[in-house]
Amino acid sequence: MEMEKRTPVLDGQGINTVLIRLAREIIQRHTNLEPLVIIGVHTRGVHLARRLADTIAEINGRAIPTGDIDITLYRDDWTKIGYSPVVQSTQIGFPIDDKTVILVDDVLFTGRTTRAALDALTDFGRPAKVELAVLVDREGMRELPIQADYVGMFVKTDKAEMVNVLLSETDGEDAVVVNTP
């Protein structure tokens, strides 16, 4: 049996450094943080969104409303996932109408998760603007015309490789690794 090669790309300190940079970019672009809300895409995007909001609050002193969204039933491939997809809760405890929503996910790959998240958001209102923040952009792998506004890092991979973001909240450690078959 062949072993999968695991290549570390970013450690916990690197993830923290990236989140600080992303927070500063958001603050710089949005001089008025009042209309800003942050929504994380389940699962790891939720934890990254909370960390990003906490980092913005530490830097700027202003708390940003944070929520999370499950996109399972909005995916265009959900029937391929299985007959009983696991649907998680969506928690958006604030209006998003006329707000700037920063949608947060761990990895931008084909763009299909982001498309599903945009579809899901419309069930909760009509934001003035939606921006996308990702920890990792798998450069050159897009199937849809979607691009992140805030990127932690670009990683070049081939389609057979997997980019995994590990977070202490779900995985017991913080790291970004590329798994090669």
UniProtKB/Swiss-Prot annotation:
GO function terms (MF aspect): uracil phosphoribosyltransferase activity
Record flagged with keyword Ribosomal protein: no
BP-aspect Gene Ontology terms: regulation of DNA-templated transcription
Residues spanning the signal sequence: none
Segments carrying motif PRPP-binding: 101-113
EC number: 2.4.2.9
Taxonomy, superkingdom: Bacteria
CDD domains, alphabetized: PRTases_typeI
Keyword Glycosyltransferase: yes
Pfam annotation, one family: Pribosyltran
Spans traversing the lipid bilayer: none
Catalytic reaction equation(s): UMP + diphosphate = 5-phospho-alpha-D-ribose 1-diphosphate + uracil
Enzyme class: transferase
Keywords carried by this UniProt record: Glycosyltransferase, Transcription, Transcription regulation, Transferase
PANTHER family xref list: BIFUNCTIONAL PROTEIN PYRR
Protein function: Regulates the transcription of the pyrimidine nucleotide (pyr) operon in response to exogenous pyrimidines.
Family to which the UniProt record says this protein belongs: Belongs to the purine/pyrimidine phosphoribosyltransferase family. PyrR subfamily.
Listed name of the protein: Bifunctional protein PyrR
Annotated source species: Desulfosudis oleivorans (strain DSM 6200 / JCM 39069 / Hxd3) (Desulfococcus oleovorans)
Source organism phylogeny: Bacteria, Pseudomonadati, Thermodesulfobacteriota, Desulfobacteria, Desulfobacterales
